[in-house]
């Protein structure tokens, strides 16, 4: 029994040794079996330590081939890092080129072929993205109709910028059509004063919250970084000198508008006063009985005539200041559309909301001057020439951004702000002090605050 057991155990040992020897022989003579076996058994090791396994295998081509296959599978499986894995796999293939074994050369060729195919798919992918991008940028209008000319970038820029400028100039006129005022009559007097109050609030808000901050380095937006850095390079004195110049130009605008109005009133006042005086004295000599009544009528008519002349001068000054202001707005619109369509549209909306209080105030001043509603609206369109000229100059300029920044940092904005302050405080607000009830005063103050608040919102948005 013991002998049989020993024989049986010996037989099992011989069988196990033969199977192991057979397996070793197959591994050494069957490359496909080596690739499958090594790939399945050692895949985790090759993937986890790819470079380490390559250095430790020495001259065994089958282990290196298996490691190459594992690297290929890892490069394809990890799709989130195509560029990194793809380049790493090429380094591995380059290492295989140093081995001269024929089987390794075959595996290396196959490995390189797989990577060539992978690279080709990447090129196709990039080509697809490039075609899609070109389609979106170059062929914005694919119609064969009248809009096809907008596919040209330069034509599209001009059409967009000029159209935006015309829209800003024409849109307030549509709002003015719904204002129930036809002329300066006693019936429309209370509403007209409310509009004058709203316009004066818009002028003051525009001057103190928009024009003056844009002319100073502290609120210069994009230009702030350039002027501020330049100021620090030249010392703090330059910063203070610029602030002083802004205040000086504001005062200069106030004095200039005062001087112009005084000169115009002197010239027109002498003619009107002489005519009124001569007519009064002539009537006094011819008809002594009607002297008192005519003097009373002459006094009543003389004051409205002087007031009308005063407000007409104010209307002309306001149109001149508004023309200059619209010129700077046109420069900004042109530069914005050069920067991009989205930037241009945002700037257009901002300027449009900003211009509505201005146009309503200008309309009220023109109506108060004696113009009819239709004539006042037509005169308002004259100021659109300032915006158009500014936009065209900006589009023709080689550096539109620098041109807009130069206009913003020059004397134009603070000088215009001084004119707006003068018109609001000297010419418009005194009109609100005459013949006002308590309820009318409340409405006028609320209108002034509304105009200022709109400019405040626009300043925050900008």
Swiss-Prot record:
Gene Ontology biological-process annotations: intracellular zinc ion homeostasis; zinc ion transmembrane transport
- Write out the entry's keywords from A to Z: Glycoprotein, Ion transport, Membrane, Transmembrane, Transmembrane helix, Transport, Zinc, Zinc transport
Q: In which tissues is it expressed?
A: Expressed in somatic tissues.
Q: State the similarity comment.
A: Belongs to the ZIP transporter (TC 2.A.5) family. KE4/Catsup subfamily.
Which Pfam families did the record assign? Zip
Location(s), subcellular = Membrane
Phylogenetic placement of the source organism = Eukaryota, Metazoa, Ecdysozoa, Nematoda, Chromadorea
Spell out the Basic residues composition-biased ranges: 40-51, 111-120
**Basic and acidic residues biased stretches:** 75-94, 121-132, 281-307
| Protein name per Swiss-Prot or TrEMBL | Zinc transporter zipt-7.2
Q: Which residues are glycosylated?
A: 184, 326, 435
Q: Name one GO cellular component term.
A: membrane
Regions of compositional bias (Low complexity) in chain numbering: 65-74
Report the source organism: Caenorhabditis elegans
Which stretches are transmembrane?
2-22, 161-181, 194-214, 244-264, 333-353, 376-396, 410-430, 441-461
């Amino acid at each position: 029994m013991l002998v049989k057991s020993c024989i049986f155990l010996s037989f099992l040992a011989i069988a196990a040794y033969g199977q192991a020897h057979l397996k070793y022989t197959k591994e050494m003579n069957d490359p496909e079996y080596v690739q499958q076996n090594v790939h399945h058994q050692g895949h985790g090791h090759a993937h986890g330590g790819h470079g380490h396994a390559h250095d430790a295998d020495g001259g065994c081509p089958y282990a290196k081939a298996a490691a190459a296959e594992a690297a290929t599978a890892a490069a394809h499986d990890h799709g989130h890092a195509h560029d990194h894995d793809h380049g790493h796999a090429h380094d591995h293939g380059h290492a295989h080129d140093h081995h001269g074994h024929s089987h390794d050369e075959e595996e290396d060729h196959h490995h390189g072929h797989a990577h060539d195919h992978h690279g080709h798919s990447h090129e196709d992918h990039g080509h697809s993205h490039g075609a899609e991008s070109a389609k979106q940028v170059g062929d914005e209008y694919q119609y064969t109709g009248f809009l096809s000319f907008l596919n040209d970038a330069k034509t599209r820029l001009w059409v967009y910028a000029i159209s935006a400028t015309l829209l800003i100039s024409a849109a307030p006129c549509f709002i003015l059509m719904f204002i129930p005022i036809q002329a300066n009559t006693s019936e429309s007097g209370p509403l007209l004063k409310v509009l004058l109050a709203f316009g004066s609030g818009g002028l003051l808000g525009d001057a103190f919250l928009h024009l003056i901050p844009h002319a100073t380095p502290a609120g210069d937006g994009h230009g702030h970084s350039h002027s501020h850095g330049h100021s620090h390079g030249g010392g703090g004195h330059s910063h203070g000198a610029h602030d002083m110049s802004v205040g000086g130009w504001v005062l200069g605008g106030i004095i200039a508008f005062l001087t112009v109005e005084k000169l115009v009133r002197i010239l027109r006042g002498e003619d009107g006063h002489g005519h009124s005086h001569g007519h009064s004295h002539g009537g006094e000599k011819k008809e002594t009985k009607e002297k008192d009544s005519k003097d009373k009528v002459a006094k009543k008519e003389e004051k409205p005539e002087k007031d009308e002349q005063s407000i007409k001068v104010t209307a002309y000054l306001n149109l001149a200041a508004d023309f200059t202001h619209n010129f700077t707005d046109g420069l900004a619109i042109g530069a914005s559309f050069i920067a991009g369509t989205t930037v241009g549209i945002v700037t257009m909306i901002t300027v449009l909301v900003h211009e509505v209080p201005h146009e309503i105030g200008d309309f009220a001043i023109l109506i108060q001057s004696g113009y009819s509603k239709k004539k006042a609206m037509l005169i308002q369109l004259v100021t659109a020439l300032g915006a158009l000229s500014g936009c065209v100059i900006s589009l023709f300029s080689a550096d539109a951004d620098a041109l807009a920044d130069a206009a913003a940092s020059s004397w134009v904005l603070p000088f215009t702000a001084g004119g707006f302050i003068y018109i609001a405080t000297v010419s418009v607000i005194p009109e609100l002090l005459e013949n006002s009830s308590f309820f009318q005063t409340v409405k006028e103050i609320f209108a002034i605050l509304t105009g200022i608040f709109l400019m405040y919102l626009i300043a925050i948005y900008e």
